[in-house]
C-alpha cells in the first residue's frame, strides 16, 4: 500500500455490543500490524419507527409501534500496509455486523 492512502471502515449493527466487540477486534488487528488507528468513532444511531393498527378492521385509535435502531462506528486506519490489509481480510466478524471498507487517497 502507498503511504498516501487511508482505509476507512464503517460498521453497522442492530446490536451495539456485537458492534463494539467487532470494532475492538479490528483495532487490535490493525495495531498488531503496525498501522496507525483512529477510532472507533460512534456515529449517530438511526432510529426507524413503524406504526401499525392492532385491529384488522376498525379501532384506528388502537395502534402499536415498533422501532429498530441501527448503531454505527467509524474506524480510520492511517498508512495501511499490505500486511494490514491481509490481516483484516482474515478477521472473523459476527453475522449481525455489516462492514464497509473504502481505500481513500489522502
Swiss-Prot record:
Q: Name one matching Pfam family.
A: Ribosomal_S10
Q: Is this entry keyworded rRNA processing?
A: no
Q: Name one GO molecular function term.
A: structural constituent of ribosome
> What UniProt keywords are attached to this protein's entry?
Ribonucleoprotein, Ribosomal protein
Q: Name one GO biological process term.
A: translation
Gene3D superfamilies for this protein: Ribosomal protein S10 domain
Which InterPro entries does the entry link to? Ribosomal_uS10, Ribosomal_uS10_CS, Ribosomal_uS10_dom, Ribosomal_uS10_dom_sf
Name a GO CC annotation attached to this entry: ribosome
Q: Which NCBIfam families match?
A: PRK00596.1 (NF001861), rpsJ_bact (TIGR01049)
The record, for HAMAP family, names: Ribosomal_uS10
How it assembles, according to the record, is: Part of the 30S ribosomal subunit.
Sum up the protein's function in the record's words: Involved in the binding of tRNA to the ribosomes.
User: Which family does the record assign?
Assistant: Belongs to the universal ribosomal protein uS10 family.
Instruction: Identify this protein by name.
Output: Small ribosomal subunit protein uS10
Q: Which organism is it from?
A: Caldicellulosiruptor saccharolyticus (strain ATCC 43494 / DSM 8903 / Tp8T 6331)
Gene that this polypeptide is encoded by:
rpsJ
Amino acid at each position: 500500500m502507498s503511504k498516501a492512502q487511508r482505509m476507512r471502515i464503517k460498521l453497522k449493527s442492530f446490536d451495539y455490543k456485537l458492534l463494539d466487540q467487532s470494532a475492538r477486534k479490528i483495532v487490535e488487528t490493525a495495531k498488531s500490524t503496525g498501522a496507525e488507528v483512529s477510532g472507533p468513532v460512534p456515529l449517530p444511531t438511526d432510529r426507524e419507527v413503524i406504526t401499525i393498527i392492532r385491529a384488522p378492521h376498525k379501532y384506528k385509535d388502537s395502534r402499536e409501534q415498533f422501532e429498530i435502531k441501527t448503531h454505527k462506528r467509524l474506524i480510520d486506519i492511517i498508512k495501511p500496509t499490505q500486511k494490514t490489509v491481509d490481516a483484516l481480510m482474515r478477521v472473523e466478524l459476527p453475522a449481525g455486523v455489516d462492514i464497509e471498507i473504502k481505500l481513500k487517497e489522502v
